[in-house]
């Protein structure tokens, strides 16, 4: 689900252990005395981060994560410590709970932030995923184009200077800023002084975190390619990146009070003015958009309430003890998951950051990797990350609102993109992506032939109709051409090693084998 970056401290198994069951390595780095001992390595990390020009806020956030790693903090959330959420505000109630009024004054105090640091490496891309074309049509708009067009349309419709920011990475900044300058230069024009030659700030950069050597908990070294010594710190870095870059203070100085934050690859995540009014009218410090879990969401995380103080908490799969697995998977008990569409009150955020030395106390997500991800023979390291949705537990009076599934349409795989490019989705005159099907069709493509974007593109001459299809599974190397319509639950299986074309036609609840015997 959105917000799940990886296992929570897999270095300690991601599960509960008694002291007697700790391994030698875990024992070496657990307990108060060992914590002091292992934290002796901290000055090396601080020196390394300062030499790279990272902010005090970024360093403080990493130090908090490193301290948890050294303490053996597994992040387990026991069922006995939480309560299921019985009722939340619905999307319809939120949209009708405020007085009808002009949205322009609120929009002038709002900024749209898109997390845009991903390269889409899981799809074989070496450029920003947001530069992928959404529809195979004449417009050829990318994710970033639609985001920019949505902002421009909202400014025009409401006569308001809605702010727009990308949280880029060092890997995506150059390409995406070049694209904006070439195709959407008006977004970089100053909002307050049209005569100024300075560009309007539309980006801030995510930080980077040093990888931790597994065996010693020292800073990891990779002499042949020092860039492998660093990793993205997860989207929980939003908060120290905003604070440490000065962007948070600049927004507040400019009169901006509200943020709407979402992933750039979630085409369902558009700024809804009624949700903005609901958020502002109730003076919530933080609001999360959630969806109802279905059977396909059983393994994904859910939100709940902490029994001790009633605050919302995110619990991911790796934070669940084995004994609680049945409770975790019970979607009638734990009903909601995080979409990663978040609303943040900047004044409350700044207060929380300053209270915690520039870094919110977020649960640690610890990924075990090879220092060179392309070489399994290289030493093991820990990558320390956090998730931005976990910040919901940092605020009193935080809120969650149940939104329709149409506001959660992420593109993580080529199957997701295949679905989005079909007629199950359309693009409106306001450049929003609209679900035309009753429910999003599930698309499972053979990873041997479709996992990489270029491979999928080479096998699709025309995307099939999926508007009345609930599930499509493709096995083998199948070429899709014009005139193919799927309905209900369908599968296509190429039984040979050679590419096989699927003939045009309508297929309803069909299990198709290629080559056809007829």
Model-identified regions with their sequence ranges:
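Hydrophobic/aromatic beta-strand patches that form the interior of the parallel beta-sheet core
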Residues: 113, 132, 165, 203-205, ...
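Conserved core of the sugar-phosphate nucleotidyltransferase
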Residues: 161, 175-346, 350-357
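Short His-Asn-centered micro-motif
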Residues: 115, 166-170, 207, 262-264, ...
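Conserved N-terminal catalytic core of the sugar/cofactor nucleotidyltransferase
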Residues: 2-114, 122-258, 468, 496, ...
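Conserved short loop/turn motifs at secondary-structure junctions
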Residues: 163-172, 264-267, 405-409, 413
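Left-handed beta-helix
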Residues: 4-108, 277-518
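Residues immediately flanking
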Residues: 116-117, 264, 346, 414
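Conserved S/T- and glycine-rich ATP-binding loop of Class I adenylate-forming
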Residues: 1, 118, 480
């Amino acid at each position: 689900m959105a917000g799940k970056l990886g296992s929570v401290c897999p270095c300690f198994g991601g599960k509960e252990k008694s002291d007697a069951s700790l391994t030698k390595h875990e024992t070496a780095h657990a307990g108060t005395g060992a914590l002091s001992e292992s934290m002796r390595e901290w000055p090396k990390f601080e020196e390394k981060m300062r030499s790279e020009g990272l902010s005090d806020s970024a360093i403080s956030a990493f130090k908090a994560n490193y301290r948890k790693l050294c303490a053996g903090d597994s992040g387990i959330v026991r069922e006995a410590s939480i309560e299921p959420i019985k009722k939340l505000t619905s999307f319809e109630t939120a949209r009708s709970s405020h007085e009808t009024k002009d949205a322009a004054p609120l929009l002038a105090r709002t900024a749209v932030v898109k997390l845009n640091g991903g390269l889409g490496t899981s799809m074989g891309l070496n450029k920003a995923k947001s530069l992928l074309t959404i529809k195979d049509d004449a417009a050829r708009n990318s994710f970033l184009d639609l985001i920019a067009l949505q902002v421009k349309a909202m400014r025009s419709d409401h006569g308001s200077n809605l702010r727009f920011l990308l949280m880029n990475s060092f890997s995506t900044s150059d390409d995406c800023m070049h694209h904006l300058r070439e195709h959407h230069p008006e977004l970089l024009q100053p909002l307050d002084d049209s005569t100024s030659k300075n560009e309007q700030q539309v980006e801030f950069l995510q930080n980077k975190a040093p990888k931790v050597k597994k065996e010693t908990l020292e800073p990891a070294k990779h002499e042949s390619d020092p860039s492998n010594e660093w990793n993205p710190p997860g989207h929980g870095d939003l908060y120290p990146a905003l604070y440490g870059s000065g962007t948070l203070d600049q927004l507040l100085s400019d009169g901006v009070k509200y943020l709407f934050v979402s992933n750039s690859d979630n085409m369902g995540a558009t700024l809804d003015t009624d949700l903005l009014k609901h958020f502002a009218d109730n003076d919530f410090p933080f609001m999360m958009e959630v969806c109802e879990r279905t059977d396909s969401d059983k393994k994904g995380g859910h939100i709940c309430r902490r029994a001790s103080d009633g605050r919302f908490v995110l619990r991911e799969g790796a934070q669940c003890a084995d004994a609680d697995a049945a409770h975790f998977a019970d979607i009638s008990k734990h009903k909601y998951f995080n979409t990663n569409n978040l609303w943040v009150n900047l004044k409350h955020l700044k207060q929380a950051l300053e209270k915690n030395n520039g870094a919110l106390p977020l649960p640690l997500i610890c990924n075990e990797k090879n220092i060179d991800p392309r070489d399994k023979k290289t030493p093991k390291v820990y990558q320390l990350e956090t998730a931005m949705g976990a910040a919901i537990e940092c605020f009193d009076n935080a809120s969650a609102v149940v939104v329709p599934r149409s506001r959660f349409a992420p593109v993580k795989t080529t199957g997701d993109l295949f679905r989005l490019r079909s007629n199950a989705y359309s693009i409106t005159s306001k450049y929003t992506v609209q679900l035309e099907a009753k429910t999003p069709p599930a698309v499972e493509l053979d990873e041997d032939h479709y996992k990489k974007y270029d491979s999928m593109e080479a096998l699709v001459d025309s995307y099939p109709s999926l508007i009345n299809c609930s599930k499509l599974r493709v096995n083998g190397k199948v070429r899709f051409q014009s005139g193919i319509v799927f309905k209900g639950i369908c599968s296509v299986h190429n039984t040979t090693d050679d590419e096989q074309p699927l003939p045009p036609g309508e297929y309803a609840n069909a299990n198709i084998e290629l080559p056809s015997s007829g």
